[in-house]
Structures are given as structure tokens and as C-alpha cells.
């Protein structure tokens, strides 16, 4: 098992895993980003996301994708957009290795914390996050506006 920074050549596999996650989260039709846009956003002249991958026997079996979020109260924070391990590779410690590496990256970059969302019905993920002394906020409501 190897945890390493994502490479441009990993993007196609990462997109496969994103689609797998969308199926698990009961939203397969919600993934509308193209591979080209995904690649440009992470590896173009002005990257807006970074990622680490979990590789087993030369195959990417999971990844964590993040970007920098700014809080007027807390300063720069890591926003964890996705952390996932393919179903076939779960239970082998890859998620823990990814999360531990994110903690290292956050400390190295002097981020004031890591924030993310989890679906309220995703008990396996919630239980996983609890071992990191995660605070779960039931007060804030998610808002979004689509620009289609």
C-alpha cells in the first residue's frame, strides 16, 4: 500500500471512483464534471484542488481530494471534498492512511483545521470519522446555487 500525491495520469481512475461514490451516495446522475474539466482544475495552470491516492499493487484503490477554504473566523482550512476507498479495498486501512496523510499535509501547510461533509445516513463513514475526534455540526444548513 502506497499513499502518494495524485498525478495527472491518475485522473481517469479517480473519476471512476467518483462515479462509484456517487452510486453509493444514491446520486449517480449528479456527477456532471467532465474528465477534461477535472484534469484542468487539478493540473492546469491554476489548480484549485489537490489530491493524494492510495495505491495497492500499482492500482489506485482510493483517494482524498481537497482544496483551500478560507474562514473569516479561523483562517485557511483544508476542505476535504472527497475521501473514498473502492468497495473491494475497504477494511484494509487505506482510509486511515489517507486521513493520516491529510493531517500531515494540513499541519505542514499551517491550515487551522480540516472540514468536510458526510451524509447523515452514512454510518460507516461517521464511525470512521469519530476516531479523529470529529465535531459533527447539526446547526448549519448546506446551501448551493447551480450555475447551469
Regions found by a protein language model. Name each.
Residues 91-104, 131:
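Conserved acetyl-CoA-binding loop-helix of GNAT-fold acetyltransferases
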Residues 15-40:
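Conserved GNAT-fold acetyl-CoA-binding loop/helix
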Residues 41-53:
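A short helix-loop-beta-strand connector motif used in the catalytic cores of GNAT acetyltransferases and
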Residues 107-117:
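Conserved GNAT acetyl-CoA-binding A-motif
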Residues 96, 108, 120-139:
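Conserved active-site alpha-helix within GNAT-family acetyltransferase domains
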Residues 50-62:
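Conserved beta-hairpin
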Residues 2-14:
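A short beta-loop-alpha structural element at the N-terminal edge
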Amino acid at each position: 500500500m502506497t499513499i502518494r500525491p495524485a498525478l495527472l495520469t491518475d485522473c481517469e481512475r479517480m473519476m471512476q471512483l467518483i462515479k462509484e461514490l456517487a452510486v453509493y451516495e444514491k446520486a449517480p446522475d449528479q456527477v456532471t464534471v467532465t474528465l477534461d474539466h477535472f484534469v484542468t482544475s487539478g493540473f492546469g495552470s491554476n489548480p484549485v484542488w489537490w489530491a493524494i491516492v492510495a495505491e495497492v499493487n500499482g492500482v489506485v484503490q482510493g483517494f482524498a481530494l481537497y482544496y483551500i477554504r478560507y474562514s473569516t473566523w479561523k483562517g485557511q482550512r483544508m476542505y476535504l471534498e472527497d475521501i473514498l476507498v473502492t468497495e473491494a479495498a475497504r477494511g484494509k486501512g487505506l482510509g486511515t492512511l489517507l486521513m493520516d496523510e491529510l493531517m500531515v499535509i494540513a499541519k505542514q501547510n499551517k491550515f487551522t483545521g480540516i472540514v468536510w461533509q458526510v451524509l447523515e445516513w452514512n454510518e460507516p463513514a461517521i464511525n470512521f470519522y469519530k476516531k479523529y475526534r470529529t465535531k459533527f455540526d447539526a446547526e448549519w444548513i448546506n446551501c448551493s446555487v447551480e450555475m447551469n
